[in-house]
Structures are given as C-alpha cells and as structure tokens.
C-alpha cells in the first residue's frame, strides 16, 4: 500500500495537469521599436506576447504611442488579439481596440478594430486642438500578425 499511494498521487497530478494546459504559461515576451519623424517626434511601438499552451497566443498586444520631441507621451493606440496556430496555419480569433490621449490638446475622435485571417487591426483618428479649436486630425491603423508557428509581429 505504501508503494501504491505515491504512484496514485503522481497519476492524479499528471491527470490534473493534462486537464488544464492553459493555466501554465510562459513569461510575456516584449519588443520595443521607435519610428522617428522629421520633426524629432516619434512613434514608440511595444508588442507584448503571452504564449499559452502549444497552439494558442492569448492577449497579444501591440501599442503605438506618439511622443513629442521631449519624450512626452501624447496619445496611444492599441490592438489586442488572440490567435490559434498549429504549424500549418494560423488565425486571429478575437481583436479589440483601445485608444486615448495624455494631453488636453489631443482627443480621440473615433476608434475601431477588426480581424482577418491571421491578423488583428485597430484604427483611430486623433484630433489636435489649439485654444479649444480643432486644428488637424491624424488617422493611424496598426496591425498585429501571428504566423503558423505562433510568432507575433
């Protein structure tokens, strides 16, 4: 009986882990890039990836933040997406958008998101205001992709 009990406990533990493979996840992978504009301001892009199990990426997120020449964040646009992949193909199973402004001179006028095949996308239009008067708009669309092996870009 003393030899059977550890074996049975090991068997039960293995069964529990088999039932819940999504509860075990790797640490998030984070990539940061910067795209400088001619006036010295820039877009900072951060991609966060959370791999869950061998065939699922949950909560992959791409955030583009517009920063001025003083490195101050002005506004941001994010797309979050879930992907399924199997080594032969991949597909986006959900996509959502988040956008906002860090200053009183910029306002998010519209935002939308969608998905198609192996990509998710988000689009936002941000208005610039001077003295309360609407001066100009900028529209930005960002995409997040997952390849057949689970690599997110």
Model-assigned labels for residue ranges:
Residues 1-72:
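N-terminal prepro-regions of secreted/extracellular proteins
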Residues 50-153:
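Mature secreted bioactive peptide module from preproproteins
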